[in-house]
């Protein structure tokens, strides 16, 4: 039975957020402190990685202090029944957090200020320092929970996303080659599919950066670094592939390219071979067809009417070379 069945129902980050909220409320109530401010801080402190929680926590704490300070100041001046107290507290909190480069803490600081005002009354110093204490409790509790409980492992998610990326990009390459051979250079170009592919690969690289951060903060086996390096290499190779594929999708308007029958056969053969990679697991080289395209491009002048044709063939050969190195 799959030990990770719970992931289909509830994610690890959701579990950690709930646990951090429970523990934060428990500590605050035990100290007879209002838990709402600590809970707000704890909820936003749970990040995808422990490193992100700690790094952003350093900025959220001073931001929360700023919000609490402005709430006390403007409540003292205008009272807790004045709209000016709310408006000016929010405005000055946002301004100062922005000036001090505390952007990640701006939201929780502003919410803290707004939630504080109705309960301050005349206990200004007590409310300020109690809010400071509860913010620290929320930050520390959430940070420890995120660090200790269910450290995230993104390997399976990354590999699944990479497999999906490769399947789509190989398929899109063959589709684009068929379009070019049919004379569909700009009309009907697969811009949407390409943008989805770029977004998918960006997601992969984001998850890889998360996993790298986690390995830096937790004990790990050398095999995990090896696995991460292999996945990173695949993602970088895919990014190169997508870059050259983009150059084949985004062609100038009114593009017209004439291919010989031999060139068409070579391009189609290479495209089919690339699209078969995902199903077969290997790259079947088409050396004869690749050589034919190399000879074709050598006979073209890059600065005459064949400039675009030369560009297209170069991109096809570069993609072929990327895969040739990858599956060497």
From Swiss-Prot:
It holds the Pfam family ArAE_1. It comes from the Bacteria. The chain crosses the membrane at residues 26-46, 61-81, 84-104, 132-152. It is found in: Cell membrane. Its main location: membrane. GO terms for cellular component: plasma membrane. Keywords: Cell membrane, Membrane, Transmembrane, Transmembrane helix. It is a multi-pass membrane protein. Coiled coil: none annotated. Belongs to the UPF0421 family. This is UPF0421 protein SSP0904. It comes from Staphylococcus saprophyticus subsp. saprophyticus (strain ATCC 15305 / DSM 20229 / NCIMB 8711 / NCTC 7292 / S-41).
């Amino acid at each position: 039975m799959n030990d990770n069945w719970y992931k289909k129902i509830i994610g690890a980050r959701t579990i950690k957020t709930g646990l951090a909220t429970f523990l934060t409320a428990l500590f605050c109530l035990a100290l007879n402190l209002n838990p709402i401010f600590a809970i707000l801080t704890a909820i936003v402190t749970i990040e995808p990685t422990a490193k992100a929680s700690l790094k952003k926590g350093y900025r959220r704490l001073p931001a929360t202090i700023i919000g609490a300070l402005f709430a006390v100041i403007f409540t003292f001046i205008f009272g807790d029944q004045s709209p000016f107290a709310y408006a000016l507290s929010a405005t000055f909190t946002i301004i100062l957090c922005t000036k001090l480069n505390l952007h990640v803490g701006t939201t929780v600081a502003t919410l803290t200020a707004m939630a504080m005002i109705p309960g301050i009354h005349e206990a200004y110093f007590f409310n300020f320092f109690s809010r400071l204490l509860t913010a620290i409790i929320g930050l520390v509790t959430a940070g420890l929970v995120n660090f200790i409980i269910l450290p995230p492992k993104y390997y399976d998610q990354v590999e699944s996303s990479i497999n999906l990326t490769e399947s789509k990009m190989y398929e899109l390459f063959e589709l684009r080659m068929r379009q070019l051979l049919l004379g569909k250079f700009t009309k009907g170009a697969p811009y949407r599919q390409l943008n989805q592919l770029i977004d998918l690969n960006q997601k992969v690289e984001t998850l890889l950066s998360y996993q790298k951060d986690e390995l830096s903060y937790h004990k790990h086996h050398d095999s995990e670094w090896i696995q991460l390096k292999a996945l990173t290499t695949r993602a970088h190779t895919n990014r190169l592939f997508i870059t050259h594929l983009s150059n084949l999708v985004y062609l100038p308007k009114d593009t017209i390219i004439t291919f010989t029958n031999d060139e068409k056969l070579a391009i189609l053969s290479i495209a089919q071979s690339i699209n078969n990679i995902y199903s077969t697991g290997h790259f079947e080289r088409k050396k004869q067809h690749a050589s034919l395209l190399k000879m074709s491009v050598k006979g073209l002048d890059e600065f005459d009417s064949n400039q675009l044709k030369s560009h297209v063939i170069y991109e096809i050969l570069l993609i072929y070379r990327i895969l040739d190195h990858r599956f060497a």
